[in-house]
C-alpha cells in the first residue's frame, strides 16, 4: 500500500501560538506519538513544523527567529533519536528573500511557506526596499462623508495587515495621501474612515 509521510506540528511551553491556531504535540509527547504511529503501517513521521518561526520586530526593524523555531529543531533531534527519518523541517512566517538569508544560520531548515513573500507584503516590506516588490493592493472608493471625514467601503480587511494610509483621487495625477482610521477590533469592517473629506466616488488605493 501507499505510505503517507506526515509533517507533525510541534509546540513548546514558551512558544507563541496565535488564537485560532491552537494545535500540536508538546515535546514530551513525541515519544508516545512515535510509539502509537508504529501501529499505523501506512504513515511515516517525516517532518516537523511550527508557526511562527520568524517574526518582524518593529523596534529593531529586523526579522528575528522565535522560540518556536528552537522547538522545531529540538523536535527534529528527539524524533531522530527515536528512530524517525526527518526529511522536512518547515519554519514558516515572514518568509521572503531576506528571511531565507537568515535561515542559512539554521542548516536543518528545509522549507518555509512562501505566503506574503510572493506578494512583497510582509511587515518587513513596510520599512525596507526588499527584493520583492509589493504587488497586492486593496481597492475601494469613497462612499460618503460625515463630520468632515470621508469613508470608503470596507470588507475583507485583514486585521493584522497594518494598513495606515490610502491614496485618494479620480486620476493618477490627482491622487492625495490620507491617513486611514481603522474600525475597532470587535467591529465588522463595513467602512474605513479617512482623516479628511474627499469626493464621493473617488478611488481609494491601500496596501
Q: Over which residues does each language-model region extend?
A:
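Active-site loop ensemble at the mouth of alpha/beta enzyme cores that anchors a bound cofactor
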Residues: 95-175
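Short alpha-helix capping/helix-loop boundary micro-motifs
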Residues: 187-196
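Gly/Ser/Thr-rich active-site loops/lids in small-molecule metabolic enzymes
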Residues: 68-71, 172-176
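Active-site loop/helix belt of alpha/beta enzymes
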Residues: 3-126
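Short Gly/Pro-enriched turn/cap motifs at secondary-structure boundaries
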Residues: 68, 131-133, 181-183
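Short, basic/aromatic beta-hairpin or loop at an interaction surface
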Residues: 173-188
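Loop/turn positions that initiate beta-strands
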Residues: 200-203
Amino acid at each position: 500500500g501507499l505510505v503517507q509521510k506526515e509533517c507533525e506540528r510541534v509546540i513548546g511551553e514558551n512558544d507563541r501560538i496565535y488564537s485560532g491556531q491552537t494545535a500540536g504535540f508538546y515535546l514530551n509527547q513525541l515519544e508516545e506519538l512515535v510509539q502509537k504511529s508504529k501501529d499505523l503501517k501506512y504513515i511515516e513521521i517525516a517532518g516537523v513544523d511550527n508557526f511562527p518561526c520568524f517574526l518582524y520586530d518593529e523596534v529593531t526593524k529586523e526579522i528575528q527567529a522565535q522560540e518556536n523555531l528552537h522547538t522545531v529543531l529540538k523536535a527534529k533531534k528527539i524524533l531522530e533519536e527515536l528512530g524517525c527519518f526527518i526529511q522536512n523541517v518547515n519554519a514558516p512566517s515572514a518568509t521572503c528573500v531576506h528571511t531565507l538569508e537568515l535561515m542559512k544560520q539554521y542548516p536543518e531548515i528545509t522549507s518555509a511557506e512562501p505566503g506574503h513573500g510572493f506578494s512583497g507584503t510582509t511587515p518587513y516590506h513596510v520599512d525596507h526596499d526588499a527584493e520583492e516588490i509589493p504587488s497586492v493592493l486593496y481597492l475601494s472608493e469613497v462612499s460618503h462623508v460625515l463630520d468632515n471625514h470621508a469613508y470608503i467601503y470596507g470588507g475583507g480587511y485583514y486585521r493584522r495587515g497594518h494598513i495606515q494610509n490610502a491614496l485618494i483621487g479620480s486620476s493618477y495625477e490627482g491622487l492625495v495621501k490620507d491617513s486611514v482610521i481603522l474600525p475597532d477590533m470587535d467591529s465588522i469592517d463595513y467602512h474605513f474612515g479617512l482623516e479628511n473629506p474627499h469626493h464621493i466616488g473617488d478611488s481609494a488605493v491601500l496596501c
